[in-house]
Structures are given as structure tokens and as C-alpha cells.
Amino acid sequence: MSVSYSAMKSAKWNGRILLNGEPAFVDTLVRAGDTVSFDPAENRPVYTPVPFPLALNIPWEDESLLIVDKPAPLASQSSAAHPDDSLENAVYAYLGCPPGFVYRPVNRLDRGTSGLMIIAKDGHTQDLLQRMLHTEDFRREYLALTEGIPFPREGLIDRPIAKENAASVRREIRPDGQPAQTEYRVVDVRGGRALVRLRLRTGRTHQIRVHLASLGCPVCGDFLYGTELPEEFPGRFALHSAFLTQVHPHTQEKIQLESIPSWSR
């Protein structure tokens, strides 16, 4: 059975791993004669992948990993809003529409964010990579163009993030939010804008966007936390997953990739 990392995580936290018919912890001791059952059902709609023909920029691939330079605007995953035009469906088409296809992104980028995304080709590889997130063996850095110059020009933003409310997609800085830390460094100043290099220590939704906006320097073109700039950044904003240093989970090879967006030059 092929099971996604998110399905396993959901089953773990929602009591859908059973030992002899009773909810069990993942570290529960199993004895001969015990029956273990697992319900992978997730509390979200299931979308059947459809081929989406898109010329993908793929800087790295082997039998277990696929690294894609995602364009923007493009949804990372299919949804009710984007059932066809998604990276998920583009990868499905690129791989030849294999039967039983399971999409296993290790990191996700917002629709308006471009850059390097890592996709595992099997569940074991995905699990290994998820365990490496935010360690020196899996280092990802971003470039952002901001409205305004962050002060100080280098530092750590350590501010908890929470959903604005149950119905909103916006996030906000709030004391009762999830811990969130972002390292940043201004690498260039261009009039009233700054080119900023960032590294996530945690992985909250919209983390970079919310943290930069909290400094009074939203990402250029960010319609949620700043000002939309449709002529300069149509359908997207100036945020890009630009640098990746990755230890291959199977071969231990060190993979180093760069993707520099045109607006940062």
C-alpha cells in the first residue's frame, strides 16, 4: 500500500492506528498474534490527478528524488480552486501518468512563490527527507524583494504565527500562535526596496511573508500582506526558493543547487 506522509501523520494524531481494535501509539509494543490496522483516510477532498502539460525545469532527478524549479503563479498541489493547473498534475504528466501515482512534496511553495521544490518518488524517501527538514542536511534559503529596508539589516525574527480567524487564509503575529523563526540578511538596497536572503528555522504557513510584513517591509507584490503589483509581478510576488543544500537520504551525496530569479539581478 502506498501512503503519503500527510496521511500517516493524520492517522497518528487522529487515532486511526489501531492495535487489536483499539487506538495505539506508534511506539506501542506489538506481540505475536496482535492485529494492527490503519485507516489512511484524510479529512480533505481527494483529487484524482489529471495530466497538466507544462515544460518543467528540473535541475536534479534520480530514482528517488525529483527537484523542480517551480514557476509562479502555479499551485503546488491540486485543490478545488486549482483542480487542473498545478505542479502536482504537471509532475504526474512528466512521470508518464503512472498508475497509483502519489504526489509527495517534501516542501511546498505558495502559488505566488517560485523556486526549488523537492518531491520524493516514494514514501520511504519522503519520510527520511521530512525528518531532515530545518537541519544542516536540508538547508533551503530564499530571496525576497521587500518594500522598505528591514532594520536591523541582519537578524532573527522570532515571532509566533497564528491564523487570523477560522475562515481566513491570512496569518498574523500573535502570542498564542505557533513558534516561528526566520533568519534574514539584507544583501542589497535598491532605492526604497531591499533584496533579502532568508532561511527558515521553522516551517509555518506564509512564514516569510508574515515575518517580513511584521517588520514593516512586506514582500513586493504580496496582495495579502502588502500591495499587489500586477504589472511588475503578475499573479505572484517577489519571493523565490533560491538555494538548496541537500544530503541525499540514500547515497549521502551532497546536492547543491541555485536558482536565481531575474528580478533579483
Predicted regions and their residues:
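Conserved beta-strand segments that form the floor/walls of ligand-binding pockets within enzyme
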Residues: L18, R104, L145, R185, ...
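Generic recognition of long tandem-repeat/solenoid scaffolds
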Residues: V68, I157, R171, A194-V196
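Short aromatic-glycine motifs in intrinsically disordered, low-complexity regions
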Residues: A167-D176
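RNA pseudouridine synthases
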Residues: M1-L156, P160-N165, V189, W263
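Short glycine- and Lys/Arg-enriched binding-loop motifs that mark or flank ligand-binding interfaces
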Residues: I17, D69, R111, L116, ...
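Extracellular/lumenal ectodomain signal focusing on beta-strand-rich modules
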Residues: R16, R108, E183, S241-F243
